From Swiss-Prot:
Family the entry assigns: Belongs to the IPP transferase family.
Keywords, ordered alphabetically: ATP-binding, Magnesium, Nucleotide-binding, Transferase, tRNA processing
Identification of the protein by name: tRNA dimethylallyltransferase
Positions bound to substrate: T14, A15, A16, G17, K18, T19
Binding residue positions for ATP: G12, P13, T14, A15, A16, G17, K18, T19
Region (Interaction with substrate tRNA): 37-40, 161-165
Native source organism of the sequence: Pseudomonas putida (strain ATCC 700007 / DSM 6899 / JCM 31910 / BCRC 17059 / LMG 24140 / F1)
Essential cofactor(s): Mg(2+)
Entry EC number(s): 2.5.1.75
Amino acid sequence: MSGKPPAIFLMGPTAAGKTDLAIELTTVLPCELISVDSALVYRGMDIGSAKPSKEVLAAHPHRLIDIRDPAQSYSAAQFRTDALEAMAEITARGKIPLLVGGTMLYYKALIDGLADMPAADATVRAELEAQAEALGLAELHRQLAEVDPESAARIHPNDPQRLIRALEVYRVSGESMTAHRRRQFAESRGADAGAGGHLPYTVASLAIAPTDRHILHQRIALRFSQMLEQGFVDEVRSLRARSDLHAGLPSIRAVGYRQVWDYLDGKLTENEMRERGIIATRQLAKRQFTWLRGWPDVHWLDSLACDNLSRTLKYLGAISILS
């Protein structure tokens, strides 16, 4: 191992079993957990985010859970700052930071840093929001494809927040978001190569998922049904009762919450809500797999295996991450 302290990333698609394995690892390694999940940061959003129970969190604390109100935003840049601070505190106590979750953009921001994007411009943003209202998101997506085809290919046509931000960056700076990111990447080439990137840590990157994608889809459907049985609709109903929350907020646009919110707005039947919630979760898992396929030096684990703890320990020993 290099002179850098160790850190472990435990990544994977939703419903793959990341949290259970992470907790197992804390029982045999001197690790402390850091959540890497854009939904778990929000207080009061417990059922639909599959947040670990209060009992589990009391026994196995996770940093960066319940750190924001749903009315607040939380960016990848903010995550990077918070995660680096948490990792430094954990390392200073002689422990190993174990980062667990499936928000892949957060991992990438942590490793590579973030391109120095232009600040938000209220006037430009208002113009774009008015266009979205008058012309529809498809027109905004068409405009983005003209000036930044790579971002247009990456951003879903029905994702207003990211569409507007990408167009805002172009209109404010005269450069596409892709151009900004390429410059950032070029500047980072001198940094350490491999999974550690800019981080002052030697990183072991693990990913867990069922080898059979059909099994993952079954798990996703079962978990969404269980969420509904556990009171997910009432959870969203409580959020809707707040005058400061609306469907356009990042918190409410989280997978599952958006579909239940639309159901409570009368836009979907109960069956449609259930079906669309499951489909949206499957699409999230597909995007997570796409990120992971391009991740450097990742070691895969099969969710269906019964010995993932021993397999993980064997791998960590083989790469000397613990020495």
